Every structure is written in C-alpha cells, then in structure tokens.
Design a protein with these regions (language model features):
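C-terminal non-catalytic regions of proteins with extracellular/luminal or membrane-system context
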Residues: 1-216
C-alpha cells in the first residue's frame, strides 16, 4: 500500500495577505499518513512535497518574515525547502505522529509553555540519493543493507559529511545550555561520565547530553 496525504486546499495570495493583517508570524502544517508496510515512497506526497505544498510555502514566505513549519509525519521527508527559504523559515518542528496527546504537546511547545528539547534520531541528508539505502529502498521481499555496518549517521560521518543537511542529534531550543565534562572513568565493564549542565538562557528548559564513542 502507498502512503497517503490530505490534499491541500488552494491558498491564494489574498488569503495569505489577510492572515498577515492579524499576525506577523505564520505556521505551516505539512502531514503524511504512514504505517506498517506503507511508510514512504520517493514520490510527491510521500518523501517529496507536493506541488500544492511547495506553492503554499512559497506564498506564505513571500508575505511573512517569520515562518514555522510543523511536520506531522511518520518519517523524515525532503527538507530542501528549508534551504531555499532559509531567510524566512525560522524554525521547523518534527511533530511526528504524537498520538492522542500529540496535539496538546504541540500546542504547549508552539505557545512557549514548554521548551522543546528533542534531538534528531536520524540524519537528514540534502538529497534522497545521499542515503546509502536509497538504491534498495522499497523491496518487499528482503531488507538489503548494502552499506554493511555503516547504517544511519555512521555512513555520513565516515563517507559523506558534506551531504548532511541536519545531523544526527541536532535540535534547537528556546534557551541555551553550557555543558562541561567534570569527570570520566573507564573500567573493564563501564564508562562513567559526569557532566555539569548550566542553563545560560532566559527560560527554563531541558537538555539532552550526547556522548559519542569510537573504537580505540
């Protein structure tokens, strides 16, 4: 089965301009419906944005200087629009499929009641062809890992650093943090790292401490 999406209503310049009369900020929602056996396809309405969605982004960014994109999707989609309209799109939020409380959680973040603290659990590349799994994607008989052990961020870190648009572990916040390693201890069975985290911003928030290791 193919992934499906809700067709966007036609968005005229007049509608966008009338919205600008009541707010100086705009929020664009883009959605995808995915599930088992119909996660994604390299088509418009799947991995790629539709022409209606691209037109919507173009119209809104032509009027608004401060635009937020909310992606209500089940998987990473093409993010090239973030480069093209980088001067107007101030933030992009992957809301994923949040379940019955997803709407409340999203509203809390957008209204500033909660500071976002999530980090990307996958690497977002510039082009779909940059992913090593692209050539084997969609085979309904077998999952072929031609990239061997270089799955996900390992592949980009090793072979294609310049192809990364948003790296594994990336994420923005309404505040800023300063992290300092206090101590680290290595034994035969474990590694213990103590980190001091200081909120250097003006609002409360949470930070994800990320530790990366490699073979000696």
């Amino acid at each position: 089965m193919e992934p499906w999406f809700q067709k966007e209503m036609e968005l005229s310049k007049e509608i966008v301009k009338s919205a600008k009369d009541v707010s100086n900020k705009a929020i664009i929602f883009i959605g995808r419906t995915a599930g088992e056996d119909k996660d994604n396809q390299a088509t418009e309405g799947g991995y790629y944005l539709t022409q209606d969605e691209l037109s919507m982004i173009k119209e809104v960014t032509s009027v608004f200087e401060d635009v937020t994109i909310v992606l209500n999707v089940g998987n990473i989609i093409d993010m090239s629009f973030s480069v093209k309209y980088n001067d107007k799109i101030k933030s992009i939020l992957y809301a994923w499929h949040g379940g019955m409380e997803g709407g409340n959680a999203l509203a809390d973040v957008l209204c500033g009641d909660v500071t976002p603290s999530g980090k990307l659990a996958g690497t977002i590349a510039k082009e779909i062809s940059d992913y090593p799994s692209d050539s084997n994607f969609g085979d309904d008989r077998v999952n072929l890992y031609e990239e061997d052990i270089y799955v996900g961020y390992r592949y980009f870190e090793t072979f294609k650093k310049d192809s990364v648009l948003y790296p594994f572990g990336y994420g923005l916040s309404y505040t800023t943090f300063e992290s300092t390693v206090i101590s680290s201890k290595v034994s035969d069975n474990e590694v213990v790292i103590s980190v001091e985290v200081i909120n250097t911003g003006s609002v409360k928030g949470k930070e994800v401490i990320q530790v990366y290791v490699s073979a000696p």
